[in-house]
Amino acid sequence: MEELQGYLKIDRSRERDFLYPLLFQEYIYALAHDHGLNKSILYEPMENLGYDKKYSLIIVKRLITRMYQQKHLIILTNDSNPNFFFGHNKNLDSQMISEGVAVIVELPFSLRLVSSPESKEIDKSMTTLRSIHSIFPFLEDKLLHLNHVLDILIPYPIHLELLVQTLRSWIQDAPFLHLLRFFLYKYHNWNSLITQKTKMILFFSKENQRFFLFLYNFHVYESESIFVFLRKQSYHLRSTSSRAFLDRTHFYRKIEHFLVDFRNDFHTILWLFKDPFIQYFRFQGKSILSSKGTPLLMKKWKYYLVNLWECHFYFWSQPDRIHINQLSNHFIDFLGYLSSVRPTPSAVRSQMLEKSFFIDIVIKKFDTRVPIIPLIGSLAKAKFCNFSGHPISKPAWADSSDSDIIDRFGRICRNLSHYYSGSSKKKSLYRIKYILRLSCARTLARKHKSTVRSFLKRLGSEFLEEFLMEEEQVLSFILPRISYFSKRLYKERIWYFDIIRINDLTNLS
């Protein structure tokens, strides 16, 4: 463990010791504003400050001074109007400064990445890896040769002070860390949102989005440090990275940066875990570690990771958060798909002179399916159907025009079809389409105070022509020269490289 601690400190010699003075620089807040924090406000209302939508050094100084006046914070709890604090919006105060803090705290990391000699080469390679679908061809190529997977939920710190102590290894500016600690305790519920999938949207809330995104990225960045030096023991460990996934960028670049700093004396310590076939991939708080090793080796991996996170990183990691599964009889729930490696038996007829015989062989096939039950649950939460999958009308959209209603339903249907174009079997997708189509018809019938049957009989089904467009028609537009094969292509898995975010219904499922 001492050798591991020494290794992890190798690249931490470039800390910026003086970050706190940057809080008083106006250009920091202008930078945070110009980088497009959606719906963020870097100034208080004019009636509160008396300034014409400006932020200045005086404002920032006053905000920081008020935030450190703990007595006033205590008095505030008994105030009848807790949203304002000496005539100012307390939430807006913290939001304004936290946006500046988010920009400043990223400096030690961004400067390291820019100065890295491999950064330009990595930037070029990222242009082809922006799509979420780019990970699935990689899985199809690699998982066929592996046997077991570790399904891991990344642990979270048990106390906020531990996160501050970890940040101290990168940032040694005490006043800045003190202010950062204030924000961590102000938003004390952030650590409960990291690994709970149902609350991921709350985690990336409208307020302080960049600040919390950095904390999450840094947390994952530290938890994945173990794979940096294990990469030398497992030469095939790779990471598919993309600028669209901010939480994966640091891991890829950290691997490239640490290549020259690896220490050979770890060879004798980690010999039990040397595995030439190991793959690691992650999205948000869930990661998958796959290997060709035996179940005993996977149990050693599990024991090793749990103890490493608890003893070195002080992360609370329950053993039941890591599940060992066999690829041949288990689905991997990842990025909205249920992926597995299924053995497919086949018979080969061989002819030798006058004799012929059959040879039974088993070929592994990468299988991806649509998770129908979670998707129906997501549609039920969005009020398109009940939890049994029975379509219902959407009353909230009944006030819109007919074309707007059809366009909304059609857009959702096409987006789901586009996202799940890589599914091996499309029957589940047909059921989702049926729910959306009938929900659209019920919504229109509700608007016109009619039944679905009479409404369709009176207007016909032509008004749903665009909504009912099948994927083979879409492929004929995308690939006009090979439209003859579009129907055949539709039956195959198709991965699109223009999908840069996971589907909302998929993410909520």
Swiss-Prot record:
GO molecular function: RNA binding
Pfam family name, one: MatK_N
InterPro entries: Domain_X, Maturase_MatK, Maturase_MatK_N
Subcellular localization(s) per the UniProt record: Plastid, Chloroplast
Sorted UniProt keywords: Chloroplast, mRNA processing, Plastid, RNA-binding, tRNA processing
One cellular component (GO) term of this entry: chloroplast
Keyword Transcription: no
Main location: plastid
One GO BP: tRNA processing
Job of this protein: Usually encoded in the trnK tRNA gene intron. Probably assists in splicing its own and other chloroplast group II introns.
Family classification: Belongs to the intron maturase 2 family. MatK subfamily.
PANTHER family referenced in this protein's UniProt entry, alphabetically: MATURASE K
Name recorded for this polypeptide: Maturase K
Lineage, uppermost ranks: Eukaryota, Viridiplantae, Streptophyta, Embryophyta, Tracheophyta
Designated gene of the protein: matK
